[in-house]
Regions:
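Gly/Ser/Thr-rich loops at beta-strand to alpha-helix junctions
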Residues: 112-113, 118-123, 146, 186, ...
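Metal-associated gating/positioning segment near the N- to mid-region
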Residues: 45-130
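N-terminal metal-binding scaffold of metallo-dependent hydrolase/deaminase domains
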Residues: 1-40, 44-48
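Active-site mouth loops of central-metabolism enzymes
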Residues: 80-98, 143-164
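Divalent metal-coordination and catalytic microenvironments
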Residues: 9, 25, 30, 47, ...
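Catalytic or ion-translocation cores adjacent to nucleophile or general acid/base/metal-coordination motifs
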Residues: 105-107, 134-148, 168-175
Length: 264
């Protein structure tokens, strides 16, 4: 049984009403407890802030896009190198560090939980392998659905239950936290060398629009009673004015579609 006593901690925890109190924190098996035995490991935190770990709710540290960055910049692995020290693995990479490099750097900033912003379902296994190689943080991921044909079929049929079944099965299969739409329908157009210029422009080869995809996804997630508060980060009409060109939406971006209803 692993026990730790953090002594003389300058604790800041507003949720618990603690605003800079000096106190000892007993920990057993990774959980704060009332007391520990006299044989515990003692850490003197005097002179240091002690506060709950940070949560980065949108990061890109694992998965296909990160690895493409590594493929395209092999010279980057010569930068950011650190040797192995004790239990710490060697690291490399500055622009796109290795998983261990990401983990150690986040730890230095006080982060203990990371949400990978976009996990491709077909590459979910490798994404989770990278999670396992990120030793200092709890990891979770939003799952990409913006080009999912099964979801498109449900949207075209206006069938919320079918959409919920697709989303629920996929999240369960890939162990995803929430759903992620990045340029819904636009990625389908890119496959044919085309693009979408508006939220109501039809998706090529489908009798649906990006608005339909977003609306159906929101309704399906509410139907599933996905936990946590409703957090919509929707940037669907971001326009860029370039001299001589009309306004054009740059990206349809919907992250972490969840509901404020409790899980059942």
């Amino acid at each position: 049984m692993h026990e730790i006593l953090i002594k003389n901690a300058f604790v800041i925890d507003p949720v618990q009403g603690i605003h800079g109190d000096i106190m000892d924190i007993p920990i057993r098996e990774g959980r704060i407890v009332d007391k520990v035995s006299g044989n515990c490991e003692v850490i003197d935190a005097g002179g240091n802030l002690t506060l709950p770990g940070g949560i980065d709710s949108h990061t890109h540290v694992c998965g296909t896009k990160v690895n493409f960055g590594r493929y395209m910049s092999p010279e980057d692995m010569r930068a950011g190198r650190t040797p192995r020290r004790g239990a710490m693995y060697p690291t490399s990479g500055y622009t796109v560090p290795t998983t261990y490099g990401n983990s150690y750097r986040y730890s230095r900033m006080g982060y203990t939980t990371l949400l990978e912003g976009a996990m491709a379902p077909l590459e979910a296994r490798h994404t989770h392998e990278e999670f396992a190689a990120t030793p200092m943080q709890d990891m979770l991921a939003n799952t990409l659905f913006d080009g999912n044909w099964s979801l498109f079929e449900a949207v075209a049929d206006k069938d919320i239950r079918q959409a919920a079944a697709v989303i629920g099965w996929t999240l369960s299969a890939v162990r995803g936290f929430g759903i992620k739409l990045t340029n819904p329908g636009g990625t389908e157009a890119w496959g044919f060398g085309d693009d979408l210029s508006g939220i109501d422009e039809p998706v090529p080869n489908w009798d649906i629009t990006p608005r339909d995809i977003i609306d159906t996804s929101i309704n399906a997630c509410e139907f599933l009673h996905l936990p946590t508060r409703c957090i919509f980060t929707v940037t669907i009409l971001v326009c860029l004015e370039i001299t001589g060109l009309p306004f054009r939406p740059l990206i349809f971006h919907l992250i972490s579609i969840q509901t404020d209803r409790p899980s059942t």
